[in-house]
Amino acid sequence: MWALVGRALAPWAAGARHAAASEPRAACRLFSAAELKEKPDMSRFPVEDIRNFSIIAHVDHGKSTLADRLLELTGTIDKTKKNKQVLDKLQVERERGITVKAQTASLFYSFGGKQYLLNLIDTPGHVDFSYEVSRSLSACQGVLLVVDANEGIQAQTVANFFLAFEAQLSVIPVINKIDLKNADPERVGKQIEKVFDIPSEECIKISAKLGTNVDSVLQAVIERIPPPKVHRENPLKALVFDSTFDQYRGVIANIALFDGVVSKGDKIVSAHTKKAYEVNEVGILNPNEQPTHKLYAGQVGFLIAGMKDVTEAQIGDTLYLHNHPVEPLPGFKSAKPMVFAGVYPIDQSEYNNLKSAIEKLTLNDSSVTVHRDSSLALGAGWRLGFLGLLHMEVFNQRLEQEYNASVILTTPTVPYKAVLSSAKLIKEYKEKEITIINPAQFPEKSQVTEYLEPVVLGTVITPTEYTGKIMALCQARRAIQKNMTFIDENRVMLKYLFPLNEIVVDFYDSLKSLSSGYASFDYEDAGYQTAELVKMDILLNGNMVEELVTVVHREKAYTVGKSICERLKESLPRQLYEIAIQAAVGSKVIARETVKAYRKNVLAKCYGGDITRKMKLLKRQSEGKKKLRKIGNIEIPKDAFIKVLKTQPNK
């Protein structure tokens, strides 16, 4: 069965499997330094000598390390100890040791007396960036599925395999980290056979860190991955699968050529915007930009054509020659934001700088959605949509590191939906089903027939001894169990349907702490389901605070309300009168905390004497406090808002 499935070929890559002679492998630089300066001639590579492949894996299984070794082995970069995460160019990627943005590199490799062009696309491993992975796979005909010999198959390994499987790509399983003391490649090989139906003898066992057996990976790429099925004599047809923004040269589009040839000076048109551009530069990524005279069908490279805005280089767009229109390639589904958070400048005088920083960063990250927003307490800001929590943290970190912009980031919320009940409301909103990304705009129960909340299908892979604890955690998060599979005698795969708002803040942390860090988690969008949602208001002495309005499930209303009231009590400064902090659903108060008043000792001047004198002074004081409480406006300091609204770890 696997012979039919695992080697299934991409629709545009159904070329015959290339049988390479099993002669000794010889890695060499195809172009000398002088030739590279002179722009290499890419016509040297016929289509049958090109392989486009991607490396996919769970976070931390050694994708970027394997990419470094492949770059060294093909002479693309010099062999030094400094080669760590060569393709991870962002500071945030190097600090966190993760890949955020997919990167491309063209490798020149001699094997069996022939010279091959191998285009490698390194992809992120974290669930939030699976959109980046699916985009990268569209430019490939095969993948290296890397699995850690110690940890075995993890949740993201499964998710990434099915992305490649659905794209009908050849899959080469690679078991990495065989140098580790606890490595058990035989066990992992059996897991791969059981879960993915790939014979264990097809697995390549390597150590990317030490470079052990890595050359056999390159041999497998040539032998097992088919060349792209393209036509160079046809008019140009190129897919834009990624883009970055350079403030001096404009948009740099990463393209995969399906048909034809592109060279400097060509006039090209975008199928999406119908705008025409003149090509200023084309080239390959080696892994840095290396200009070439031309790019030919089957090759992957970059193109600069004077586009001023990344929205002009739409991901999934087709580029073609002016006066030679072609049938556009099927694009990608645009990434759907799963998490929304308010972003405000710490000081309103920084608004314009932050606006400019967000605009520049969203040029490079088209999956972030931006809506203008304002708050009485925090001033003008934005409501940004992200693919997940890590995506949000990385975006915030990049704002600070690359643009020196410090921001207030509010607790993330998820996009709810409401089905409106009356024709009048439907006419007002212009649709029956409205999406709510700001809790303050949540419609009343009387206006809707039902509320809907987003749900995701989550996969948890855990050692069997933690199964009970993890199942209890999932049930506490309102999850419904769908499936349970034993991968081997020590590990189990659980599938649950989760409400997205239950996992968005701290589920991952709780899962890791319950399983001593051994469990892994991945999720995919599963649409919407009806839910009993309520809008919870926070009142201070009876006055509603708009910024603290939240949407919660009815079951969780008390817990969340109590938590917000407690945090607000810690943050609010004491006044001369008592402050009642209440959480209310509709007219019903469900939680309350009290900030005690400062008390002046009005009896200090009384030395003994009649008790009625003391009672009179105390009565006058309490009347004054009542009056003050009625007319007193509670000023909530900005710091208090920040403490309450900011993401609360492990709360």
From Swiss-Prot:
Primary role: Promotes mitochondrial protein synthesis. May act as a fidelity factor of the translation reaction, by catalyzing a one-codon backward translocation of tRNAs on improperly translocated ribosomes. Binds to mitochondrial ribosomes in a GTP-dependent manner.
Transmembrane segments: none
Organism: Mus musculus (Mouse)
Identification of the protein by name: Translation factor Guf1, mitochondrial
EC numbers on record: 3.6.5.-
Membrane topology: Peripheral membrane protein
Residues annotated for GTP binding in this entry: 57-64, 122-126, 176-179
Chief site of localization: mitochondrion
UniProtKB keywords: GTP-binding, Hydrolase, Membrane, Mitochondrion, Mitochondrion inner membrane, Nucleotide-binding, Protein biosynthesis, Transit peptide
Principal EC category: hydrolase
Stated family: Belongs to the TRAFAC class translation factor GTPase superfamily. Classic translation factor GTPase family. LepA subfamily.
